[in-house]
Regions:
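Helix-to-loop junction immediately C-terminal to a conserved catalytic motif
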Residues: 48
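The feature captures the beta-strand-to-loop junction immediately N-terminal to the Walker
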Residues: 33-35
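Conserved ABC transporter NBD signature motif
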Residues: 56-64, 76, 109-110, 116, ...
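ABC ATPase NBD coupling module
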Residues: 64-84, 111, 123-126, 219-224
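Conserved ABC ATPase signature
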Residues: 128-132, 136
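ABC ATPase signature
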Residues: 91, 132, 145-146
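A short, proline-enriched helix->beta-strand linker immediately N-terminal to the Walker B motif
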Residues: 147-151
């Protein structure tokens, strides 16, 4: 389990994250919602160690990790799919997937499961990442994050700019991974219907703080749609 307690983060004189607390449980999808600019991506970057926190704690499996480097956090089992995918355009699909195995012993094979989850990657194994469509690149980015077998998978707006058929495939994979029961999933998402379909529980952020939280099945009753409407 990933546990965040009362973290604060500043950028210059701006207070970006304000006493944010949350838990991401194994076997569950925790969805983070909120309008643009409320601190969602900064929160994820803080969890990965890409930006420092001023106060509070981040723990994984009971061990505090907020002083660890991004590399050390990845080795502990945090997989991150950033907004914009950030695949290596000049590398082949196979080479991109092997980048996800950088923390594993040399010669570790690419898990066959990745091609079961995303069959299109098997067909395009020797194509350059830059030649793939946006949806295919997103599938590659998720597969790369899964290659090392993370205990926590963090996704930042995986449906952004993706065609509906691939959004459906990505949702199916996320649900399957959660139901398998060996991974916690933390999902930042702007597409409300996609988030509602997947959420076991949720938080809504506003101005860097947690405005609301609850069970995914209660999102409509709790009025979450109106809280995140643009």
């Amino acid at each position: 389990m990933l546990e965040v307690k009362n973290i604060n983060q500043y950028y210059g004189g701006s207070h970006i994250l304000r006493d944010v607390s949350l838990e991401a449980e194994v076997g569950k999808v925790k969805v983070i919602l909120g309008r643009n600019g409320v601190g969602k991506t900064t929160l994820l970057k803080s969890l990965m160690g890409l930006v420092p926190i001023k106060s509070g704690t981040i723990s994984m499996g009971g061990k505090e990790i907020h002083k660890l480097t991004p590399y050390e956090r990845a080795r502990l089992g945090i997989g991150f799919v950033p907004q914009g995918r950030e695949i290596f355009a000049r590398l082949t699909v196979e080479e991109n997937l092997r980048m996800g195995l950088a923390y594993k012993p040399a010669g570790t094979p690419i898990p066959a499961e990745l091609f079961e989850l995303f069959p299109v990657l098997q067909q395009m194994l020797h194509r350059r990442g830059g030649d793939l469509s946006g949806g295919q690149q997103q599938q590659l980015a998720i597969a790369r994050a899964l290659a090392a077998g993370p205990k926590v998978l963090i996704l930042d707006e995986p449906t952004e700019g993706i065609q509906p058929s691939i959004i459906k495939d990505i949702g199916r994979v996320i649900r399957m991974l959660a139901d398998r029961g060996d991974m916690a999933i933390l999902l930042v998402e702007q597409y409300y219907d996609f988030a509602q379909e997947l959420a076991d529980n949720y938080i809504v952020m506003e101005r860097g703080a947690v405005l609301a939280r609850g069970m995914g099945q209660n999102m409509e009753v709790d009025g979450v749609r109106s809280l995140v409407a643009i």
